[in-house]
């Protein structure tokens, strides 16, 4: 263990490095690049219609009336949470100024596994919003008792409440039978009926946020009738809108640290991924973090490209967590074909990839599966959105083969798969593997 002087020196060194990192950072206000931050109205882009609708629907809360229930739907990163949170924040401030008790109770349903857990999370968040004790344990009592406590908190502390259920379609619950009512259906019925049944003295409205345009089709008939929401549709952002979103967060960075073209290329990458503003903002932030790590005072295009690769690698790694070794090996064999090819390959012939797979099983001392098994593994890779496939003919009498195109950069896929210790041996034999890949490509296309 270090003595007193060494410990003091270490503390000073850590403190100095922390201060230096803050002082030399390219960021001025990094919080502006948090996709979940509630932002000012002048930073909102391309959502005028949705903003108008939600303002109209929530205005009754300031007039002593109940706002309608709402269903906000559209792909991820299209501004659903951003807009509802921004409007609710303004309603809260105006209501407080005129002496009304308005509450906003939010939960994200992504990680909530059951109806009971969702109700407890509502109780907990309502208690926090009201500044009172939760009053019930997480387990050991019935869901109805937790609901009673939730209604009690709302009645005692608020005149009007909006309950925001983000990613509500993920609150499926434990369905023992495909015909069982999903947990979100039961919860929506209970919340939307609470005022009508006299369970709550004030006004209660529910805003459900989902990516699924067919969400209402899965609701129980009673829940659908009781919830009866006003729909607000959020389409994808286009590249110009994404660019404008980033421009309005430019002041997250210090003056003159952004190289020309940083914002357009960040927007272009995100536009390729279904116009997701959340991903555009993440990419814009990660580029700055990479510049900070490299102790550079300018955010360059190379940092954005590195950030895009990091994002792809993280996404790929997450998706690959549950894949077996054979599935990873099949995907790896396919990915290295365009990476190692001396030709410009846009698509990978399954014939070539399978032969490379056979070679890899040999050098890695892994079991060799049949061609049909390889094709089955790649079909599964397609369902995970790693690749797309197309059947191709090679002329009369030459048969048909599949060709695979990678959704993300195949080099990123290959590098990510190499992190599995069972595939490390392939990296050690890189020169040999390259020669095999190109020999198989030449044989396929030239018949040598």
Which stretches of residues belong to each language-model region?
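Terminal-proximal interaction/regulatory segments of ATP-powered molecular machines
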Residues: 347-448
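Short amphipathic alpha-helical interface segments
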Residues: 325-359
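Conserved catalytic segments around the Walker B and adjacent sensor/switch elements
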Residues: 69-71, 94-111
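Conserved AAA+ ATPase "sensor/coupling" helix adjacent to the nucleotide-binding pocket
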Residues: 122-126, 244-255
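C-terminal helical "lid" subdomain and adjoining coupling/linker elements of P-loop NTPases
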Residues: 256, 265-326, 341-346, 364-370, ...
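Walker A/P-loop nucleotide-binding motif
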Residues: 65-86, 90
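Mid-core helix/loop region of P-loop NTP-binding domains shared across ATPases and GTPases
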Residues: 10-15, 114-120, 128-218, 222-229, ...
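A short, basic N-terminal segment
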Residues: 1-68
